[in-house]
Structures are given as C-alpha cells and as structure tokens.
Design a protein with these regions (language model features):
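Active-site rim helix/loop that mediates acceptor-substrate recognition in acyltransferases
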Residues: 1-15
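Conserved beta-strand in the GNAT
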Residues: 13, 17, 24-33, 37-44
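Short hydrophobic/aromatic beta-strand or adjacent loop that forms the aromatic wall/cage
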Residues: 13, 112-119
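A short, internal acetyl-CoA/4′-phosphopantetheine-binding micro-motif in the GNAT/acyltransferase core
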Residues: 19, 43-50, 74-76
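Conserved acetyl-CoA-binding loop-helix of GNAT-fold acetyltransferases
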Residues: 45, 51-64, 87
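Short glycine/proline-centered loop/turn elements that form peptide/ligand docking sites
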Residues: 55, 59, 77-81, 97-105
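Conserved GNAT acetyl-CoA-binding A-motif
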Residues: 64-77
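Conserved catalytic-core motifs of GNAT/GCN5-like acyltransferases
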Residues: 71-74, 91-110
C-alpha cells in the first residue's frame, strides 16, 4: 500500500528498480543502511520476468560499491528465497546468530523471529 511504502521510505529504505522497455518495473530491491550493515528489506521480480537474471542483477547493483556487510532476513519456509540468496553467495548464519541479528536490526514480533532465518554475505563472515 502507499502508506506502507511511505513508512519504509521514512525508515530509510532505498529502492532500486529494474525497468522494462517502457515505464513498467520488472523488479525492485530495497536496502536499508543500519550503520554497520545493510539490510536487504525487499526484493521482488514480476512473475513473468522470473528466472531471467533480473533479481541477481538488482542484487549485484546494490551491493557492488558498498563495503559494509549485507544481511537478509526471510521466512524459514521461503525455500525459493533462501536458494536465491545462497546462489549469490549468502549463507545462513545459524539459529543463535539469526535471533541476535533479528533483535538487533529488525523490529519484528517474537513469533516471526522463531520462523525466520538470516543470511549474510562474505563481508559479514570476513568481519
């Protein structure tokens, strides 16, 4: 919704889009600077444009010139999302670290923490 998008923008989430030939977006990614890390808060590709490398291009675009680590949180059941991030070098940080990171960088209910996973890029593991 427009109000949710406005709240995300007000919270510092910056969006990048992948346009089609016209003005229509095929994909979008939103990242948030949390001082010592960046969070991938949103990543979506239109159904008709999936499996064409758009998500990977968006991910590469937003991560390439930033030295800070990137973290992404998602549902444990979102196997497709976990597979996508693993394909692009992200790794599961484990349950204890997931809980700590979700409490530190995200504002989500306890139940969501229990059913989520955090994946981190190489910069996180190199710290």
């Amino acid at each position: 919704s427009e109000s949710y998008l406005t709240a995300e923008l007000d919270d510092g989430v910056v969006f990048q889009g992948f346009p089609d030939v016209g003005d229509r977006l095929l994909g979008v990614i939103g990242i948030q600077d949390k001082v010592d890390v960046f969070l991938i808060r949103h990543a979506y590709v239109r159904t008709l444009a999936r499996r064409q490398g758009i998500g990977g291009q968006l991910l590469d675009h937003v991560t390439q010139d930033i030295d800070k680590p990137f973290l992404v949180g998602t549902w444990k059941a979102a196997i497709w999302a976990i597979s996508f991030y693993e394909k692009h070098g992200f790794k599961d940080v484990g349950q204890q670290e997931t809980e700590r990171l979700l409490k530190t960088y995200w504002s989500i209910p306890t139940r969501q923490i229990e059913t989520s996973v955090v994946l981190a890029d190489d910069r996180w593991r190199a710290r």
